[in-house]
UniProtKB/Swiss-Prot annotation:
This is Snaclec anticoagulant protein subunit B. It comes from the Eukaryota. Disulfide bonds join C25-C36, C53-C142, C119-C134. Residues 1-23 form the signal peptide. GO terms for molecular function: metal ion binding; toxin activity. InterPro entries: C-type_lectin-like, C-type_lectin-like/link_sf, C-type_lectin/snaclec_domain, C-type_lectin_CS, CTDL_fold. Residues 24-146 form the C-type lectin domain. PROSITE patterns: C_TYPE_LECTIN_1, C_TYPE_LECTIN_2. Expressed by the venom gland. It comes from Deinagkistrodon acutus. Anticoagulant protein which binds to the gamma-carboxyglutamic acid-domain regions of factors IX and factor X in the presence of calcium with a 1 to 1 stoichiometry. Also inhibits platelet aggregation by binding to platelet glycoprotein Ibalpha (GP1BA) and functioning as a blocker of vWF. Is devoid of hemorrhagic and lethal activities. Possesses antithrombotic and thrombolytic activities. Also hydrolyzes the Aalpha-chain of fibrinogen. Does not affect the Bbeta-chain and the gamma chain.
């Protein structure tokens, strides 16, 4: 009887310790390094995809990459959901144009751009990031911190 209790207690401790590893993400999301990810095979332009992500879960946005390992995880996950191609990431020039500066160091106050702001997508044929008009339609991956 003592051995049964010991083994049962050991299994309970093991179960409780393992249950916290992926329990922070909803069941239809995937977990990696404290973040939850979900690819969507619902092509949208960048702004609509970002808006869609914010409605899926508190704190959710289009995916951002902090390491090669994270990018590899997300790419594999994404292409299990949709075929190879492209998908939106959360990187864009929409929100912050302070990267632009005149050569005389004057701040950029007036603009007359010919094109819309650019957004970044991941291209599977060479695993590189590319920028294009934010109006393009693409699949996307949402992410939030668990």
């Amino acid at each position: 009887m003592g051995r049964f209790i010991f083994v049962s207690f050991g299994l309970l401790v093991l179960f409780l310790s393992l249950s916290g590893t992926a329990a922070d993400c909803p069941s239809d999301w995937s977990s990696y390094e404290g973040h939850c990810y979900k690819p969507f095979n619902e092509p949208k332009n960048w702004a609509d995809a970002e808006n869609f992500c914010t409605q899926q879960h508190t704190g959710s946005h289009l995916v951002s990459f902090q390491s090669t390992e994270e990018a590899d995880f997300v790419v594999k996950l994404a292409f299990q959901t949709f075929d190879y191609g492209i998908f939106w990431m959360g990187l864009s020039k929409i929100w912050n144009q302070c990267n632009w500066q005149w050569s005389n160091a004057a701040m950029l106050k007036y603009t007359d751009w010919a094109e819309e702001s650019y957004c970044v997508y991941f291209k599977s044929t060479n695993n590189k990031w590319r920028s294009i008009t934010c109006r393009m339609i693409a699949n996307f991956v949402c992410e939030f911190q668990a």
